[in-house]
Amino acid sequence: MKILAIESSCDEFSISIIDDGKILTNIISSQIDQHVNFGGVVPELAARLHLENISWVIKSALESSNTKIEEIDHVAYTEKPGLIGSLIIGKLVAETIASYIDKPLMPLHHIEGHIYGASIENEFVYPVLAMVVSGGHTQIEIVNSPNEFEVIGATLDDAIGECYDKVARVMGLGYPGGPKIDKLAQKGNKEAFIFPISKNDDSYDFSYSGLKTAVINIIHNLTQKGEEIPVADIAASFQYAATKIVEKKLEKAIIQFKPKTLTVAGGVSANSEIRNIIMSLGKKYNITNTFVPKMEYCTDNAAMIAKLAYEKLKSSN
């Protein structure tokens, strides 16, 4: 069973082909260089660049997987959530291909895809406890099957990735800010500044607006005083506060729900501290199936959509 999957929810246009659970190809057209000067993704530009990249991405996916379009059995695409213009482009491409080869169309959820990106090389044993961390989402999900997802907690304001990017912008690090802060944090003292660990309560919800404001205020105060900004120390202290609450909420969820698989998903799953937290908690609570996605599957890609589609189809047979 061959599935062609399309991911276009933001500034990546990606096509992947999977054959009976094995990824044959995962072509990604990234637009980071085009958006960096704007300090973030420009929706109209993202959609226009998707249009320009469709042809070569499709051609590359078919050629690199040695697949003829007629050999595809199902066509999957990201339906939501995301930038509306970018999503429409992906949907139209998927509908066109499915109509041309007369094969079923599968609209899928972007976040569910991210979670299954972690299962590309590691099979899930249910129930799965998944920590979703990205530019648009920060949430904890219980996954009981490819068709059963329960969000037990989510951010009430800023997502963790959004917070990283905004702090990085004020620090003058540019976009995308997450990897740059993570790298700087390795050189800094996490105890140099005491930033608030927000939403430190019994719920599974998150809040990052207070942390973001606290860091920005420190930077502005130092700037107004004409003092040097210790970027490494600020990065380390910020990262500690941003990730410590993830550790606390996840540990509470592990104790309550007793998952058989522990994983993390989304663009911020590439963060070194987040990855360390996942592996440490898995070891502490003897969760044998504890894993983080390969770096290539952390950010948006169609392989994760292809794997989700495959698992859904397999579960229905």
Curated annotation (Swiss-Prot):
One MF annotation (Gene Ontology) recorded for this entry: N(6)-L-threonylcarbamoyladenine synthase activity
Keyword Coiled coil: no
Annotated EC: 2.3.1.234
GO cellular component: cytoplasm
Keywords, ordered alphabetically: Acyltransferase, Cytoplasm, Iron, Metal-binding, Transferase, tRNA processing
CDD domains recorded: ASKHA_NBD_TsaD_bac
InterPro entries named among the record's database cross-references: ATPase_NBD (IPR043129), Gcp-like_dom (IPR000905), KAE1/TsaD (IPR017861), TsaD (IPR022450)
Protein name: tRNA N6-adenosine threonylcarbamoyltransferase
